[in-house]
Amino acid sequence: MLRACKANNVRRLAITSSIAAIRSVRQENWPADNTFDESFWSDTSPENTTISTYNTSKTLAEKAAWDFRESLPEAERFDIVTLNPALIMGPAHQTNDFASGGIVRDMMASSGPVGRTRMGMVDVRDVAKAHLLALKVDAAKNQRFLLVSKCAWRKEMVECLAAEFNPKGWNIGTEERTDDDVFNYEANTTASREVLGLEYIPIEQSWIDMANTLIESGFIPRPAASQ
């Protein structure tokens, strides 16, 4: 793709990367305040015993794109913008298994407690919009953009889903396990808000919209009482 852009005189390329290229799995490598921005790279060193193949692939792929650009003579370089979304939520129409849909499906099916996990999430519609803005906004050239609507606890998520769907026949649990290790980070999204001008959809709406579309597609079964 990068070679094709060069050969066809493409002026700017927006690349879908991931927060996995920014946030390491190993918490010992996190910043002191657990807050990530675009200056961070996921740790792919061989010494990292908790290395993730997913994080590694995303990190090396994005670095390869930047390295390719730098390898070109200055007169032949085109602009690159990378978008690094967190866990993507919002309307979905897949019927096959996928990570974020599986999380919502499992929450909808369980009355038990959830883990003590807080992670970044973003609406798929905001991710799409960010790609368009990355191509249009001049100041975005040759930058990375961390895309996070909110860093939310899983307990927040099940409470939101329970409030919306338990009156409709579901029995979604809202308790939190107390024996889990805490996984908790924050995201600094100043760049996406100020440079791209992105205004994020509230993540609570994203959870509800995702659940509704996955119910409609059959990915999330309806409770027996409502069928």
List PLM regions with ranges.
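Glycine/proline-rich active-site loop of Rossmann-fold NAD(P)-dependent oxidoreductases
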Residues: 74-76, 90-103, 133-145
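Alpha-helical substrate-binding/gating segment
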Residues: 105-145
